[in-house]
């Protein structure tokens, strides 16, 4: 098909003017189209940049959150402070409590340590944390399983008392009418925890029968007895399935370290070449266990406290020392065991154990706890005091 090209010289002045306008509009349209293309390209570039920046920001926040969790697991108070400073957590107690309750990436021991502190903010967080639990229509053992799974119960009696007091109040609020008072719930909770130890701790030879459990809890319901059927259900539940705590805080040693009398960092003198090494110590069931790290599932060493004594000692290289020794067999090796470099369990070679605390107060607290562990069973003091309170009403 032939295209006819018009010679401008053949156009009238009006037609020539109209043609010029058409060309001008065409040029304007092409320029507008190019501007739109440039603007679209710029928008896409900004979107790409924004997505990249957002991804980078999210990656940075995730990195900071990971750091915060690690800091929390090493030092709970510093970890919370770091998360607040980096705006990953607010200072509101409800926000902190939810963070601990969800527990993503958090060590249960560290959660228990934070909740056990006596500072006003920690006490408020403890209350908010307990309120995160819904115990409605659960029997006491079911509620305890849920509660004790969410953190590791610390070893100090005062901390245990505060936590179990808060638990008892929350359980009674969720289940009105089950017990006449929170004291009843408190005492029975301790009885159940001690029953768990009696039935499932391999170190306990005398397994408590149901009748002993009933006798132990006579008169705790504001002077009256609890229904035997209720006690039977709790007893059977614990007998068939012991309490468990998260893998990162117990492993196969769940029952052993479930409720330590005391735990913390100390320096221990040992090795062929005598050196001081930092170890995490746990005092429970008349034994002193020490670990290289708080997250270790197996101890580096076990020191049975039977027939041993503890005393303050002076050391030329370390202050605030205590010593474990056998008063009737001075010079003989203490019966203990440790894990060697190959992972084998070998007999200890110590005639005494020398341990250094951070300060005099901490040393004295350890000495008191060790002496108490040698002579009495954990929980009995708290339980006895609360029973006296109930009887006195």
From Swiss-Prot:
Transmembrane segments: none annotated. One of its GO terms (biological process) is regulation of ARF protein signal transduction. Residues 386-393 are annotated as: C-terminal autoinhibitory region. It is a peripheral membrane protein. Residues 13-56 form a coiled coil. The keyword Membrane applies. Keywords: Cell membrane, Coiled coil, Guanine-nucleotide releasing factor, Lipid-binding, Membrane. Residues 259-375 form the PH domain. Signal peptide: none annotated. It is found in: Cell membrane. Residues 54-241 form the SEC7 domain. GO terms for cellular component: cell junction; centriolar satellite; cytosol; intercellular bridge; plasma membrane. A 1,2-diacyl-sn-glycero-3-phospho-(1D-myo-inositol-3,4,5-trisphosphate) binds at residues 268-275, 279, 290, 300. GO terms for molecular function: guanyl-nucleotide exchange factor activity; lipid binding. Binds via its PH domain to the inositol head group of phosphatidylinositol 3,4,5-trisphosphate. Autoinhibited by its C-terminal basic region. Promotes guanine-nucleotide exchange on ARF1 and ARF5. Promotes the activation of ARF factors through replacement of GDP with GTP. This is Cytohesin-4. It comes from Mus musculus. The gene is Cyth4.
């Amino acid at each position: 098909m032939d295209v006819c090209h018009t010679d401008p010289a053949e156009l009238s002045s009006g037609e020539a003017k109209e043609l010029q306008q058409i060309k001008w509009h065409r040029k304007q349209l092409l320029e507008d189209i190019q501007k739109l293309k440039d603007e679209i390209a710029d928008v896409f570039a900004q979107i790409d940049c924004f997505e990249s920046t957002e991804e980078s920001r999210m990656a940075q926040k995730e990195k900071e959150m990971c750091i915060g969790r690690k800091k929390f697991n090493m030092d709970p108070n510093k970890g919370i402070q770091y998360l607040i400073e980096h705006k990953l957590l607010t200072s509101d107690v409800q926000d902190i409590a939810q963070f601990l309750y969800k527990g993503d990436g958090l060590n249960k021991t560290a959660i228990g340590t934070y909740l056990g502190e006596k500072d006003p903010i920690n006490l408020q967080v403890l209350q908010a944390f307990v309120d995160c639990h819904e115990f409605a229509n659960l029997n006491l053992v079911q509620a305890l399983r849920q509660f004790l799974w969410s953190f590791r119960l610390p070893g100090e009696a005062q901390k245990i008392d505060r936590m179990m007091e808060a638990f008892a109040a929350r359980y009674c609020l969720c289940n009105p009418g089950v017990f006449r008072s929170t004291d009843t719930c408190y005492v029975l909770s301790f009885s159940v925890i001690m029953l768990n130890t009696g039935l499932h701790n391999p170190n306990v030879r005398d397994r408590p029968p149901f009748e002993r459990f009933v006798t132990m809890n006579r008169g705790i319901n504001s002077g009256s007895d609890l229904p035997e059927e209720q006690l039977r259900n709790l007893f059977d539940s614990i007998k068939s399935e012991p309490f468990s705590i998260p893998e990162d805080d117990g492993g196969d040693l769940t029952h052993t370290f479930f409720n330590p009398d005391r735990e913390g960092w100390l320096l221990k003198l040992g090795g062929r070449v005598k050196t001081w090494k930092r170890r995490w110590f746990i005092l429970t069931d008349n034994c002193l266990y020490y670990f290289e790290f708080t997250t270790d599932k197996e101890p580096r060493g076990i020191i049975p406290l039977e027939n041993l004594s503890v005393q303050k000692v002076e050391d030329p290289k370390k202050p605030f020392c205590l010593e474990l020794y056998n008063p009737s067999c001075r010079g003989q090796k203490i019966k203990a065991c440790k894990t060697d470099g190959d992972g084998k369990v070998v007999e200890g070679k110590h005639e005494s154990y020398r341990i250094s605390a951070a300060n005099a107060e901490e040393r004295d607290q350890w000495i008191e706890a060790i002496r108490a562990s040698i002579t009495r069973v954990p929980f009995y003091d708290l339980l006895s005091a609360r029973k006296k309170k109930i009887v006195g009403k």
